[in-house]
């Protein structure tokens, strides 16, 4: 498949093409043509001329539709009644092109950055270099910087997602194609081992074509654990230590007396295997598997790197001196063949002790073991100390260049990954905690009916119980299946902490947290597992409790809950035991589903302001954990801009955020891309912490008042459609593939928390994913246009004055600018023409006209309001990279959407052919891959 000739064809919709930079993008379009041609040849060779011609017809017609805004009827006719045996290769062809186009776009970004640097241009925003320049200009006080960055941490938390399920073979093949295209972009025609690059690309594309993209069976949690861990070998083991060392060195050079960043600033986390909110498949065994596999991944990496260091550090004692400490370390390796190689002997001692550590804490044996009969390391700090001994000896005797290579990365890696690799959060719904704790209290004879108590009596009872050391139940207690399971999970977490260290399970997140008793109930469960002891003068609390505020109402009440928690002396003592630090998690997904994009965004902002004020008054350090999804409808959008859009004091040196779905692969599958994205997170965290980025000054309160009013209007407009329109749920179920997301083999977790068709009980991921697949993208924009239109018309000022107020906020306020920028991205990716095809799946014509009519009207209204407030005709005027992507890549989504509609129609009509189901699943994954942030 080659790129269609553009000629004089015009773009579709509000995303307008510009000739500016066309010359600069020619290399990317050439890469797309190359990969498309190779894929087209592969389709022809493997599936025959007839399938190839069908793919080509669909491709050409799709470009005509996208570029000329012609009617889509021909595409719909092309796929109506298509033989399923032809439909599958067509779906696979366009899905593979989406994957290959992603590669070309990523390579182009690398190319543009290299050109930018080579030209000597100023560093780009979101880079660490640009951030350092801003910090230098600010002339910050050393003591202020030290206090602001005390305990600083930036933690991307990997979570499972139903459409990010690519098999390892596909993952590795895509990585190989990326490496080959990188060589091609650099002007090479052969690989380092003499292979022809184009021929090797053909081999890899053929491998990709002949490999199943998806699994035949429903994804298991063990599969999701493996998917999450693969990013360490792919990028994290190299990039995270590099970023940590670079940031620490740069900041200490600027403020040498401040002793900054004793601990690594970037520390990854995970939810995969610990998040049991609505997922009955997460058990104690799964927690043990997740933490054990993570520890295995870390130690296996260290052993492999130590083996490589042994091969590289071959210095002879006859030629190079060593420190006494290095000589003493080497003494424990008595191998005569290496008597003259002190560094190799020292490294073998380290490898021998780490082998003993692996034997003690792992359930399976990694490669590169070396059994010297030495004692294991008790802690990662002991391992680090031995590596530091090797480093110090190298530096003391003229070998700093060697110390700064593989050994430096390994030392930094041990600092951040320890024996645990990444912190696994526990998460459960507050309703489950309540049910289990009520049972435990009844069994122990403390109270027969805890759930009947009012809130103040619950808090009093739970606080008293936390103040005692005795557990409520013993191992022989006869409990319900639910209580047994919940206690088993927290006991498995306690086991992981004992085995791998306290960083193995650092946080316990409470979903739907609405009261102080919700927090204390979780504390009771942790106490039962020995993870909380508040009875003595020095409380023990290795696991932090993080209330998750998810709905609009909960966000409004969050500060009051935090204040009441911290007013309890016993809980305050637990916070003190954790360095006077308390984490609160903010839920973007459910608040959006509850109240719409704008109301949710503003509720989160207001909640942050209030939480920061409570923390300031009480004197604790607040860390906010942002539960962001890949899409704008779930809090997504560019991370750098999102962090800078936080209110004053909300970042405070520390930030955790979830990374989900296709976003994980887009950000972290390749080392170069991963480094850029991690640097962007750190850069924004430093700027938001150390600089005044809000920019509102004395005008903050009037600005907040405007958003208070607009958010109410937006929530009302959203609720009128989603919660109050008769038949809306029926429309949603029929016009999107949400039912199929639940019934086909997608993800390990049910689509709803409860077995109902209620929007409230539906999980946020299928809610957003379904609207993304049908190209409505409703959660990312609906209600916003009406809100702005009504606010402009309702005020005491003139319409022009009200527009000027909004335009001024857009110009000066990063938060408001981010809201409108993310809104534009969603609108640009939406396509109401395609959405109309999905609407035809709704049998009730009156319902279809009523609901889709409202959606189409609001879509037009929102685009018009965006143009009015920003002054930009083009939705993506400030995002040329996405504009290029929409223009060059989105035509290839057309056939996937049309085929999905066709196959959904067949499946719902009773066609139970397994290939029809597989085709639907393939279209879902293809669209998710192409959109790169579909859920």
Curated annotation (Swiss-Prot):
GO terms for biological process: carbon fixation; oxaloacetate metabolic process; tricarboxylic acid cycle. The active site is at residues 161, 593. GO terms for molecular function: magnesium ion binding; phosphoenolpyruvate carboxylase activity. InterPro entries: PEP_COase, PEP_COase_bac/pln-type, PEP_COase_Lys_AS, PEPCASE_His_AS, Pyrv/PenolPyrv_kinase-like_dom. Its EC number is 4.1.1.31. It catalyses: oxaloacetate + phosphate = phosphoenolpyruvate + hydrogencarbonate. Its cofactor is Mg(2+). The keyword Cell membrane does not apply. The keyword Nucleus does not apply. GO terms for cellular component: cytosol. Disulfide bonds: none annotated. Gene3D superfamilies: Phosphoenolpyruvate/pyruvate domain (1.20.1440.90). Keywords: Carbon dioxide fixation, Lyase, Magnesium. Belongs to the PEPCase type 1 family. Forms oxaloacetate, a four-carbon dicarboxylic acid source for the tricarboxylic acid cycle. This is Phosphoenolpyruvate carboxylase. The lineage of its organism: Bacteria, Bacillati, Actinomycetota, Actinomycetes, Mycobacteriales.
């Amino acid at each position: 498949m080659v790129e269609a000739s553009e000629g004089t064809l015009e773009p579709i919709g509000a995303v307008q093409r510009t000739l500016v930079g066309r010359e600069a993008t020619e290399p990317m379009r050439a890469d797309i043509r190359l990969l498309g041609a190779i894929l087209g040849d592969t389709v022809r060779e493997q599936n025959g001329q007839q399938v190839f011609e069908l793919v080509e017809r669909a491709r050409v017609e799709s470009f005509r539709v996208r570029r000329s805004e012609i009617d889509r009827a021909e595409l719909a006719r092309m796929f109506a009644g298509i033989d399923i045996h032809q439909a599958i290769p067509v779906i696979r062809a366009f899905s593979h092109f989406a994957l290959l186009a992603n590669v070309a776009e990523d390579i182009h970004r690398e190319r543009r950055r290299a050109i930018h640097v080579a030209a000597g241009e100023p560093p780009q925003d979101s880079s660490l270099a640009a951030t350092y320049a801003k910090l230098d200009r600010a002339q910050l006080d050393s003591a202020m910087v030290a206090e602001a960055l005390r305990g600083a941490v930036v933690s991307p938390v990997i979570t499972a997602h139903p459409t990010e399920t690519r098999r390892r073979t596909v993952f590795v093949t895509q990585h190989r194609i990326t490496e080959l295209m990188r060589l091609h972009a650099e002007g090479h025609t052969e690989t380092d081992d003499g292979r022809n690059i184009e021929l090797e690309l053909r081999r890899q594309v053929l491998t990709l074509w002949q490999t199943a993209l998806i699994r035949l069976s429903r994804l298991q949690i063990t599969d999701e654990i493996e998917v999450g861990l693969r990013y360490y070998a792919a990028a994290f083991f190299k990039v995270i230590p590099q970023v940590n060392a670079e940031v620490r060195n740069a900041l200490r050079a600027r403020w040498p007396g401040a002793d900054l960043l004793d601990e690594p600033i970037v520390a990854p986390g995970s939810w995969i295997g610990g998040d049991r909110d609505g997922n009955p498949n997460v058990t104690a065994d799964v927690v043990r598997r997740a933490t054990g596999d993570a520890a295995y991944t870390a130690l296996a990496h260290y052993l492999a790197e130590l083996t490589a260091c042994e091969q590289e550090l071959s210095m002879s004692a006859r030629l190079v001196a060593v420190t006494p400490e290095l000589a003493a370390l080497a003494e424990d390796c008595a191998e005569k063949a290496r008597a003259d190689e002190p560094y190799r002997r020292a490294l073998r001692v380290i490898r021998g002790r780490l082998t003993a550590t692996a034997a003690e804490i792992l359930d399976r044996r990694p490669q590169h073991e070396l059994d010297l009969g030495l004692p294991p390391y008790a802690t990662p700090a002991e391992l680090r100390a031995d590596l530091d001994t090797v480093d110090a000896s190298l530096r003391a005797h003229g070998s700093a260049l060697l110390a700064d290579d593989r050994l430096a990365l390994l030392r930094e890696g041990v600092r951040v990954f320890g024996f645990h690799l990444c912190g696994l959060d526990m998460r459960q719904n507050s309703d489950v905690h309540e049910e289990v704790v009520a049972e435990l209290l009844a069994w122990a004879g403390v109270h027969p009916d805890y759930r009947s108590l009012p809130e103040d009596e619950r808090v009093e009872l739970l606080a008293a119980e936390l103040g005692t050391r005795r557990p409520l139940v013993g191992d022989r207690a006869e409990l319900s299946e639910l209580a047994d399971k919940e206690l088993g999970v927290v006991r498995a977490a306690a086991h992981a902490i004992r085995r791998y260290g306290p960083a193995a399970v650092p946080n316990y997140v409470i979903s739907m947290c609405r009261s102080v008793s919700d927090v204390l109930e979780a504390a009771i469960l942790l106490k039962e597992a020995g993870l909380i002891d508040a009875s003595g003068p020095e409380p023990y609390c290795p696991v932090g409790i993080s209330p998750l505020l998810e709905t609009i109402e909960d966000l409004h009440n969050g500060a009051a809950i935090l204040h009441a928690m911290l007013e309890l002396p016993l809980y305050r003592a637990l916070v003190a035991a954790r360095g006077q630090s308390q984490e609160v998690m903010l839920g973007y997904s459910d608040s959006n589903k509850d109240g719409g994009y704008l109301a949710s965004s503003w509720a989160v902002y207001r909640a942050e302001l209030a939480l920061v004020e409570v923390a300031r008054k009480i004197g604790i350090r607040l860390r906010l954990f942002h539960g962001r999804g890949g899409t704008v409808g779930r809090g997504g959008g560019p991370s750098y801009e999102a962090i800078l859009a936080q209110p004053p004091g909300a970042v405070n040196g520390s930030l955790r955020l979830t990374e989900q779905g296709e976003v994980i692969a887009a950000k972290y599958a390749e080392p170069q891309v991963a480094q850029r994205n991690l640097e962007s997170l750190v850069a924004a965290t430093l700027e938001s912490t150390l600089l005044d980025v809000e920019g509102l000054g004395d005008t903050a309160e009037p600005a907040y008042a405007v958003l208070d009013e607009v958010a109410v209007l937006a929530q009302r407009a959203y609720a009128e459609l989603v919660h109050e329109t008769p038949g809306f749920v029926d429309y949603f179920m029929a016009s999107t593939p949400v039912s199929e997301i639940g019934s086909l083999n997608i993800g390990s977790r049910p689509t709803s928390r409860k077995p109902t068709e209620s929007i409230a009980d539906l999980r946020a991921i299928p809610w957003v994913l379904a609207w993304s697949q049908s190209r409505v993208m409703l959660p990312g924009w609906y209600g916003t246009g009406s809100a702005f239109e009504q606010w402009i018309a309702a005020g005491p000022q003139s319409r022009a004055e009200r527009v000027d107020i909004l335009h001024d906020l857009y110009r000066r306020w990063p938060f408001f600018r981010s809201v409108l920028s993310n809104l534009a991205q969603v609108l640009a990716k939406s396509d109401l023409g395609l959405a109309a095809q999905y609407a035809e799946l709704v049998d009730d014509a009156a319902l279809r006209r009523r609901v889709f009519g409202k959606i189409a009207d609001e879509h037009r209204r929102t685009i018009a309001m965006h143009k009015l407030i920003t002054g930009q005709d083009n939705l993506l005027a400030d995002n040329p990279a996405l504009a290029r992507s929409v223009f060059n890549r989105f035509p290839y989504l057309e056939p996937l959407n049309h085929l999905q509609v066709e196959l959904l129609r067949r499946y719902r009509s009773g066609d139970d052919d397994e290939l029809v189901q597989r085709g639907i699943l393939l279209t879902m994954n293809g669209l998710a891959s192409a959109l790169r942030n579909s859920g």
